[in-house]
Amino acid sequence: MGSDLGVSVKAFVIGLIAAAAACLITSYAELAVKYIQIGFLQLPPVVVGLFVFLLLAAAWARRLSARLGLTPQELLTVYTMMLFAAMISSRGLLEKIIPLLVTPAYFANQSNRWADYYFPHIKDWMVPFDPSNPQVNSPQLVAKRFFEGIRGGYEIPWHQWIGPLVWWGLLALLIFGAFLCLASILRRQWVDNEKLTFPLAQLPLEMVRDGRDAGFFRNRLTWLGFAVPAIVFTLNGLHGWFPSVPMLNLEVHLEQYAVNPPWNHIGYTPMFLSFAGVGFFFLLPVEMLFSLWFFFVLTRLQQVVAGSYNMDMPGMPIYPTKLFIGYQVMGAYFILAGYLLYVSLPYLRHIWRTTAGAGELDDSSELLPYRTALAGLAACFLGAAVWFAAAGMSPWLALFQLGVFVFIIALVMARSVAEGGLLMTETSFRPVDVYRMFAPTHTLGASNMTVLAFVDAGFFRDLRGLVLTGFLDGLKIADGAQIRRRAFLLVFVTAILVAMVVGAIFQIWLPYRSVGGGNNLYSYPYASNNIWGFTDYEPAMRGPVPGVGWQAPTFFVVGAAVTAFLAYMRYAFHWWPLHPLGYALCASWTMIVFWFPCLVAWIIKSNVMRYGGMRTYVRARPFFLGMIMGEFSMAVVWALIAWAAKAPAPAFPWP
């Protein structure tokens, strides 16, 4: 699907400004306002909200002069740049990396003995503090002032941050480069051959669609859907200012009502009502919806049954799931990645022959020529492995960690967005958990565990904001807008670089200049994710630790077998209702948050399709897209109000 349309200078310049704005709003809303997390979803609310404002501004400018207006292609170029800016400035990179770099210096104490265990293995180019000079009783000032704020007119120590940020930025660019090349390879198979729907790309395309069928913004159902979350979050926001205004509760915790055995083993089971979540899930096939919520409920039933037999149920390290379920998921990921490879084999053979000179596939309209994509993927992958090795990781472990991350975890997460429309990319295991199935953690050695404590927190543990999905959705948007795919290469690269620079500057400035420093900002980046990697490896640093036991390999095999069965049934019988992707995602934070909106959407859509058919579904789509637009737009509105008025904002149902 080719096109001669490229990226205009006007769209590029506006995109730069919009990307910088998305960085600043995301960073302030998530870190300072705290209640509004608007950047870490795979379709960030800040992007949708700002895009609505951009559409209104473009319409107003067009009335003044046709030359001032923006074409759909230009609007979607700006949208794509904001998409990457929001991801990078949130959990996609910066909120995890920046606090991490001063965490060992600030949180080391005589009790945890991090200075003895970790500091000797930290390379000085990795961090802004001096690891050869641990100050346990009084942290080095670069870390102390970051977490407690600057007093007495001291300046921000920018010079201490520049070097480490450059090195970590290089690692991020290598990983992002591998994802870019992988997306270029996957696009034709997933879009043209398998015809995946890419639900997260549908809303922006619909918002700029020309006015046939009354147009998206002229459709009453669009605004009716918009009004539902707009009214709810207006009331909830006003309730924070004026308690007499009623508040509509969007969160119920089932575990609070399951107090008697064996139901008290159900674990953390919230019911969040996200209108945007219902809207996105409505776009999915009914069998996918059923699989997603069914397998999540099955995890809770497994815990209840295991509890009734007094089975030992340790938790998965630093994940909110039980170990026996986490390793089922791991087995599912490995089989699902193999299944995706299997169904892609004919296409991959064509790519290989094309790169060898046989010329079986025309890659002139792809993001990258196949030969460049394959070479780039190998170079970026090996470059990241060299970075890990330079930081102190054994080369074999670096290749293993990156291999599991890129070709299994990230691949399945990208598929969950492209096919399952999931708003979050979260899994239930890290690459190191695969190693732990075969050997205890302490056998890795202190140097390896030190590097893992950093890269787990920075890249491997929390995958929200995974840019691989941004590349794939961006290419789908380019196709929908008839934009030349290769023209989007500049859009992708520039947006990432702008986000890394603008976001890093602001997120270093903010804790130093805030009252109370990072300790008074959102706790997840400054007192949770940044610490968990070090606390996880701390027992193994102290001495030998036991392995994960029989549950890990046993339930890995169970998960692999179940997924193989589901994949075979789905491949062989089109009527089979259970999707292996639903099983692979069953224990993730994604489904913990969104299982209830998925259930609601399944009930609605199954009845719409049963009693109204495809025609009714098509007519109802604008209502559900309007709910997405309404919830996300209100998140941006309240973030801006909270920033301007220094006032509370309502919580939104995607923690």
Task: Indicate where each model-derived feature is located.
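Hydrophobic alpha-helical bundle architecture
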Residues: 36-39, 67-68, 282-284, 475-491, ...
